[in-house]
């Protein structure tokens, strides 16, 4: 997906609409959250922020020690809060955060101005796409993406680009929601969820992506369902922040019906 050809719904959602301002994404991290250990009796906006931070931590812990030596990049960084968290809490050697949307890069630089000043040589926000990453060959130790790959039009070029920019032995970590296989699944999701109907989200079967990764030269590809710690917590928070009939309440239904699930994927470059 060339950054000069952003799909209209992606351009609008992360441009003029600025999804981070929605109450359901309190805190600006723009992910569904990892709710393990959070009391769901009456979740607060602070709990929502914590859930989103925890999803980043779940991803970043997948990188091996000593992390202080690792040069990382994030694909689909949004407002860039996750990249700042990565440096602050995990002390990676450097993190370069990439997003296809120029408005998001502008916001990331503004929101994280203090972090950029604190880590002038270790934190950066730059324009780029999953299919054309702005890095030389073999230049990174790690690459990660948090709830962004569902917006990529296809994942084959992302897998190939990840393999290109990672050094041998480098690690890719991706988390987002993937679908069950089959054209009928994609059609059912379009009926249930407006984000699939309008093209914001793309139905990517999990098995197709793991095949792309092995085809690109990745080894030790592992997948883990983390849906039980994502969907119930998200839906409980949505119950207090959106109308009862809002389409986002159907994510829980889609998960329970086996149409999609939230996964954590790790893969090492051969």
Question: Residues of each region from the PLM?
Answer:
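N-terminal auxiliary segments of SAM/dcSAM-dependent transferases
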Residues: 1-27
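A short glycine-rich, Lys/Arg-flanked "PGG" loop and its adjoining helix->strand segment in the class I
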Residues: 156-171
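Conserved alpha-helix/loop element of class I SAM-dependent methyltransferases that forms part
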Residues: 34, 50-69
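Class I SAM-dependent methyltransferase SAM/SAH-binding core
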Residues: 73-132
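A short acidic, Gly/Pro-enriched loop at the edge of an enzyme's catalytic core
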Residues: 131-142
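Short, glycine-/aromatic-enriched active-site segment of Class I SAM-dependent methyltransferases
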Residues: 177-200
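Conserved catalytic loop of SAM-dependent methyltransferase domains
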Residues: 219-244
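Short alpha-helix
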Residues: 201-217
């Amino acid at each position: 997906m060339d950054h000069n050809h952003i799909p209209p719904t992606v351009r609008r959602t992360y441009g003029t609409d600025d999804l981070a301002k929605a109450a359901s994404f309190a805190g600006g991290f723009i992910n569904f959250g990892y709710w393990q250990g959070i009391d769901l009796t009456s979740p607060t906006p602070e709990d929502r922020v914590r859930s989103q931070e925890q999803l980043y931590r779940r991803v970043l812990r997948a990188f091996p020690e000593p992390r202080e030596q690792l040069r990382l990049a994030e694909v689909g960084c949004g407002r860039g809060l996750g990249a700042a968290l990565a440096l602050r809490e995990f002390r990676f050697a450097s993190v370069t955060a990439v997003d296809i949307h120029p408005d998001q890069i502008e916001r990331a630089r503004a929101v994280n101005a203090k972090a950029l000043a604190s880590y002038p040589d270790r934190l950066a926000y730059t324009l780029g796409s999953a299919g054309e990453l702005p890095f030389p060959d073999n230049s990174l130790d790690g690459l990660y993406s948090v709830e962004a790959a569902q917006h990529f039009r296809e994942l084959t070029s992302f897998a190939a680009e990840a393999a290109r920019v990672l050094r041998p032995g480098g690690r890719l970590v991706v988390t987002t929601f993937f679908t069950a296989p089959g054209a009928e699944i994609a059609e059912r999701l379009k009926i249930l969820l407006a984000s699939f109907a309008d093209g914001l989200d793309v139905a990517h079967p999990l098995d197709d992506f793991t095949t792309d990764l092995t085809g690109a030269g990745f080894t030790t590809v592992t997948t883990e369902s983390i849906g039980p710690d994502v969907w119930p917590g998200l839906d409980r928070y949505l119950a207090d922040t959106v109308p009862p009939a809002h389409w986002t309440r159907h994510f829980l239904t889609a998960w329970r019906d086996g149409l999609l699930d939230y996964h954590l994927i790790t893969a090492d470059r051969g």
